[in-house]
Amino acid sequence: MSARGKIIAILVAGMVAMAIAVPMAMSDDVGTSATVNNLAPDVAITTISPDPATPPCTVTVSGTLSDPNGIDDVSTLTYVVRKPNGSTYTSGSATVAASWSFNFNLDSYADAGTWTVEVTATDKGSLSDTDSKTFNVSEVIAFSIDFNKTNYGSIDPGNASTVSGDTTMETVGPAPPVKPTIKNEGNTVIDIQMSITDDASNPEPLFVGNTSATVGSVGPQTLTSAATTFDVNIAKGDTAKIDTTLSVPTGTSPGDYAGTLTITAVSG
């Protein structure tokens, strides 16, 4: 074999050896695993408005909500509103959202004092978080009466005329035929103050000092131009009767007389 032929044979043999040395391609699958822990949501009340609240009114509660597993992991957002004595006033559910709010109404008789709102977020794994915040309800003194005039009729000097009340609220009108009643429309116990004045056109003073009143079971007390207090303690939502009597002194000039009865409620 010539020298050239030997070189070619050697090159070919080398190439074959190189081809045999290259490994064939291979693959395999390896499983992986992990556990993502469920963590509790985080809820916070940011504002309660108005504070203080004056009933009757609507109260708005706002706040924030988050969850390490995502907001979609939160299943419910519930609330409880508690009175100053801790009893439940109202409860319900709010829409689950990163920024949430809900409203509730305070009625006229909502107790004055410190109220509490509790909000609870619960996720799909039953983990929960609760936040609470207080707000104040103002004292409201309010009342209504069912009479707009008291007519004692014609009275002889030396005699008296009484207009009696009852505890049933009627359509507002003159007494009689209406039987005077007062109702506590506020959110606290009230006492009553009453005063009376004579019109300047009267022939002489008549009502001042000659009119007496009984509120509920308190009285009779003589009414003057200064306020007289009836310690009657009318509870919120309750009523009391008002009886009044006009005594006409002997020697009183004949004629038509008019006056003004002023009724004021104060905290009892």
Predicted regions span which residues?
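Aromatic sugar-binding surface patches on proteins
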Residues: T95-N105, D111, G237-I242
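Short flexible loop/turn segments that cap and initiate beta-strands
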Residues: L65, N69-T90, I192-S195, D256-T260
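Short coil/turn motif common to extracellular beta-sandwich-like domains
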Residues: T54-T60
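Exposed beta-strand face motif in extracellular beta-rich ectodomains
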Residues: G113-V119, A240-I242, Y257-G259
